[in-house]
Amino acid sequence: TPDILHAFLQHGGRAAFELRAVLAATLSPTWGIYSGYELCENTPLREGSEEYLDSEKYQLRPRDWDTADTIAPLITKLNTIRRRHPALQRLRNLRFHHADNDAVLVFSKRAGQDTVLVVVNLDPHHTQEATVSLDMPQLGRDRDESLSVHDELTGETYAWGTHNYVRLEPGRAPAHVFHVQAAPASPQIGGSPAS
C-alpha cells in the first residue's frame, strides 16, 4: 500500500525517493504517490515501524509546498516523459537487459517505433558503475547496430552499442531514461556524450 514507509525510504534519503519514483513511473503504465512522497517525508512513528509519524489516516497535515525541499521537478519531468512515450503507457512490453552489477537495473519498453531504455542505480548511498549489455533484438535493432540514446532526464545524448559503460551517482543522476533513436552517421561507441 502507498502509506507504508519501508526502511529503504526511512534510511535511503532523497536518493531513495528519486530512484523509486523513476522505477514506478517507467515500469508500469500507471503510477501514483502518497501525499508527502514528493517532499521525501520519511519519519516513522517509532524505530522499526513502517507507519508514518504524521500519517494522514489520523489527521490532516498542512505542508508548506513553496519552501519545501522537493523532488517535484523530477516527478514533473517523469510525467512529461510518460506522456511523450507510448512505450511507457503499455504493460506487457517490459524487457530486462543485463548489467554486470546487481545494484544496476536495466530494462526497456517498446511500442511501435518508440523505444525507451531505463538504467537505474538501486543503491541510494553509493555511486554504481556497470557494463550494460543490450539485447538488441528486444530493442527492435540488429545485433551489431549502433544506437543514439537521448537521456530524457538530463538532455545528454550518447552513442551506444551492445556493451556500454554507465556510472550513476545518487543525488546527481539516479537513472538514465533513454529514448532510443537511429544511430548518427558516424557513431562513437561508448558512454561519452555525443552532443
Model region roles, listed by residue range:
Residues 7-12, 17-20, 27-28, 33, ...:
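Carbohydrate-interacting/catalytic domains
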